[in-house]
Amino acid sequence: MPGRNIVKKNWIAAAAAALILTIGVSQQAHAQTYNLTLCGASPGGLWTLLGAGIDAAVKKSFPGSTVTYQTSGGGLANVGLLNDKKCDIAIIHDAEAKAGVAGLPPFKAPVDSLATIAQLYTWAPMQIIGSKSYIAENGLTSLEDIAAKKLPVRIVLNRRGNIVRAVGEAMLNAAGASPKDIESWGGSVTYAASNEQGDQMRDRRADLMINSLFVNHSSIRELASAVDLAMLPITPETAQKVIGEWDIQDFTIKANDYDWNDKDILTLTVSAQLFARKDADPKMVKDVTQALVDNVADLQSVHKAMAPLDVKLMSQAKTVPYHPAAKEVFAAAGF
């Protein structure tokens, strides 16, 4: 029956066309690729490894994509680079983002273009480490004792232009021992890069150092092999003052995290977070966030220090609001 055959042929043709269209749409969706620039820091550090992990995660979800790590002066520089659209995404510390959005030095005006994608780590605490003999001889039990005793202490902070230096100064100020106070008591506050801080401690040119480092960092282990060390906590009141100023988080270094420390140490921590611009393509932000959620193991594996990272922690940044597209992904994941 020719009429029935014609209908059958037309139905087959229509079905084939629909199948081809469906396959085409599916392939088009799967073929989404990204070529993104990530602003990081100097080459060779943990942020470089995180850049590689982010690249691997995005590649896994969107084959053919590339996230190129661009070296920079660090998080403070990245606030400006992201604001100026010199990169698509950037790693920035929470305190650096706070400086940007609040217009604190070195920024001359507030930067209101930032949006959070994900929190990457929260375990780089401000460690107040000193010579065990100095701490014992002066009866120090906390950072605040320096102010109470008006000690002529020699403290070394991170170099100028580094946000950790600003947080260290904020801790001293909140404890009642500002750099000016310490100088008036006959002491000194100097500024040096992390490796130089260790040298000053080894050479007995500094009594205390304050720096943001991972617990049990190799530089601290090396210093402990040359100098008997002890650690000082801050009080909850000091912690809250600095948290209010910098929107950072408190942190407890556990007893026996070091074999030379036997008590819990309250301090503060700076956190690294991944940012985009508020006006970034929502689909890009959603896809990158989803790639991180789906492939968190690619970030965990870049360094043993990243093992604690999970999706819940990614969703818990507080300093700058999340991009709505990133927030949507975390909400769908239950956070």
Task: Please give the residue ranges for each predicted region.
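Extracytoplasmic "Venus flytrap"
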Residues: 34-54, 74, 160-164
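Sec/Tat signal peptide C-region and signal peptidase I cleavage site
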Residues: 25-31
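Short beta-strand->loop
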Residues: 39-44, 130-131, 150-164, 191-192, ...
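Pocket-lining segment of extracytoplasmic ligand-binding domains
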Residues: 94-96, 104-105, 116-118, 132-135, ...
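Bacterial N-terminal signal peptides
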Residues: 15-24
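An extracytoplasmic/periplasmic, membrane-proximal ligand-sensing/linker region
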Residues: 175, 196, 203-204, 208, ...
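Short, polar/charged alpha-helical segment
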Residues: 47-64, 168-173
